[in-house]
Amino acid sequence: MARISGIDLPNNKQLKIALTSIYGIGRTRALEVCNKSSISPSKIAKDLDNDEVNRLRKVIESDYIVEGKLRSEVAMSIKRLMDIACYRGVRHRKGLPLRGQRTKTNARTRKGKRKTVANKKIASK
């Protein structure tokens, strides 16, 4: 079992798919990594030898930000937006959509479960 960036790659999948289990590597970047390390993307992950795993590891660690470092970088970016109190930061803080979507209806995923207001119909009369 190949272990790259602290993640065990799934054994029975092609390399281009197995690499996507690493946070920060999608399909396109997985193909880039395979090409840079000169390994066939259709090779099964369990068939990799130590030399190939080391080449993959070296390419990923030198050229890309992945896993914990990427997660902390994203969190720091969001925290910076919240600290400077720009529009996006305020929306992050309130837990609302950031990019202009409507919120009168919809936006349930971002807002969470409905919070019912007691006696709303009585109060509106």
Curated annotation (Swiss-Prot):
Keywords per UniProt: Ribonucleoprotein, Ribosomal protein, RNA-binding, rRNA-binding, tRNA-binding
GO cellular component: cytosol; small ribosomal subunit
Chain residue ranges for the region called Disordered: 95-125
Gene Ontology molecular function, alphabetical: rRNA binding; structural constituent of ribosome; tRNA binding
Family matches, as InterPro entries: Rbsml_uS13_C (IPR027437), Ribosomal_uS13 (IPR001892), Ribosomal_uS13-like_H2TH (IPR010979), Ribosomal_uS13_bac-type (IPR019980), Ribosomal_uS13_CS (IPR018269)
Example GO BP: translation
Keyword Cell membrane: no
Pfam families: Ribosomal_S13 (PF00416)
Family to which the UniProt record says this protein belongs: Belongs to the universal ribosomal protein uS13 family.
Reported function: Located at the top of the head of the 30S subunit, it contacts several helices of the 16S rRNA. In the 70S ribosome it contacts the 23S rRNA (bridge B1a) and protein L5 of the 50S subunit (bridge B1b), connecting the 2 subunits; these bridges are implicated in subunit movement. Contacts the tRNAs in the A and P-sites.
Description of how the protein assembles with itself and partners: Part of the 30S ribosomal subunit. Forms a loose heterodimer with protein S19. Forms two bridges to the 50S subunit in the 70S ribosome.
NCBIfam families reported for this sequence: uS13_bact
The protein's name: Small ribosomal subunit protein uS13
Species: Borreliella burgdorferi (strain ATCC 35210 / DSM 4680 / CIP 102532 / B31) (Borrelia burgdorferi)
